[in-house]
Regions:
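Pyridoxal 5′-phosphate
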Residues: 1-138
């Protein structure tokens, strides 16, 4: 019997999703940024997906950004948020047990002049609340 314990990173697709994705890959394999027919077909699938996600999340379609994966998403979220708030907030708080994509991005932000606070965690990986309080109100 197989036990897959990394569902946070990737999870098996349902058969229904597999069929939809395979159909899209078969029918609309063009570059969605291109102006040719296959590109426009692919862009239709991308826009339709963005609309459905936006509706589900009750946000604007323009707020949906597709990335290649978790690392790119973490970089975009962390760097974008940090740089947008640089004048009002220069301290970032994290832990040493984050995913490498977060730790590497925090190191990059430290090199850009941000103060990075690494909170300690207990044996179960839970943040020590006293350390968090101190980091929030030095």
């Amino acid at each position: 019997m197989e036990a897959y314990l990394d569902n946070s990173a990737t999870t098996r697709c349902s058969e229904r999703v597999q069929k939809i994705v395979c159909a899209a890959m078969d029918e609309a394999y063009g570059n969605p940024s291109s102006m040719h027919k296959k590109g426009m077909e692919a862009e239709h699938y991308v826009r339709e997906a963005a609309q459905k996600i936006a509706k589900t999340l009750k946000v604007s379609e323009k707020e949906i950004i597709f990335t290649s994966g978790g690392t790119e998403s973490n970089n975009l979220a962390l760097i974008g948020t940090a740089m947008a708030n640089r004048r009002s907030a220069n301290r970032l708080i994290t832990t040493q047990i984050e995913h490498p994509s977060v730790l590497n991005t925090m190191e990059y932000l430290r090199e850009q002049g941000f103060e990075i606070i690494y909170l300690p965690v207990d044996q179960k990986g839970v943040i020590l609340l006293d350390a968090l309080r101190e980091a929030l109100d030095p």
